[in-house]
Amino acid sequence: MWRSSRRWLLLCLLALTSLASAQPMPGTVIDLASGQPLDESMFIQRAAGAQRLLLGERHDLAGDHAAQRWLLQALHQQRPQGALVMEMIASERQPRLQRVQRWLAKGNHADGSRLQELLDWDARWPWAAYGGLVQDAAAAGIALVGGNLSLAEVNRLLASTEPVAFPVAAARQRLSAVVLAQHADAAPMLDGMLAVQFARDRRMAQVLTDAPAPALLVAGRWHVLRGTGVPGHLPPGTPALVIVLASPGEQVDASDADLLWVLGDD
């Protein structure tokens, strides 16, 4: 049984490597500092050289989720990937994640639905969208790390009426505009919602700093921008590469990110 399990794990790892090498890079990657496109080889070399990599997604686009899987596989093929940090998992769930990962490391097997059950996956983040990325990490033995607040922490912060001081002064104004544009009736709760955003970014920065390197953080776009999110909470001098997924024609300032990864809107 042990030999059979080890053989299954080896096949998973080989499949992961083959998939990354067989699939071309989706979309186009632009270096925001120079305005020049990067080919697949240049992109992977740049990303693989970063000890802390932040990837900002649109939560509801299948193309973004496919790009995340492609990048994780390509990075792990280039060099061993230390950790995958996800906004979609609360950090309080780390003991459970570690138990499941130790169980898998012993050669046990869990398919998609079984892995979802073992992790007690948060249904607010559709497994159909993120399950593939989680399964890829599990199959490759990459440490899976939760980066978000618990629901209890969120609820407590939402009741806050004290303004928070963001690391970047303009962040409050930028995030306030986004929140009010998306939730027209949110003005009475604005301080609480910004407190949640601030605390989430601080938590993800802490987790990303402590995670085995090289570490990849997958989070919403506003969480990874230098002007509004996680980078401002990292220890001073911490090198980090910021990649933002975007649609054709979208603009992102070079002060917010290093690379713009342009995909379709699917």
Each predicted region: which residue ranges?
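Bacterial N-terminal signal peptides that target proteins for export
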Residues: M1-L9
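Sec-dependent N-terminal signal peptides
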Residues: W8-L16
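N- or domain-start disorder-to-order transition segments that initiate the globular core
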Residues: L13-L14, S21-A50
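Short hydrophobic beta-strand that contains or immediately precedes a catalytic carboxylate
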Residues: L53-G56, L216-A219
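Solvent-exposed loop/turn segments at secondary-structure junctions
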Residues: R58-L61, I89-R93, S150-V154, R221-L225, ...
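Histidine-anchored nucleotide/phosphate-binding helix
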Residues: A66-H76
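A substrate-binding/cap region within the structured catalytic cores of diverse enzymes
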Residues: Q78, G82-A83, M88, P95-P212
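C-terminal regions of proteins
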Residues: V134, A199-T209, L216, H223-D266
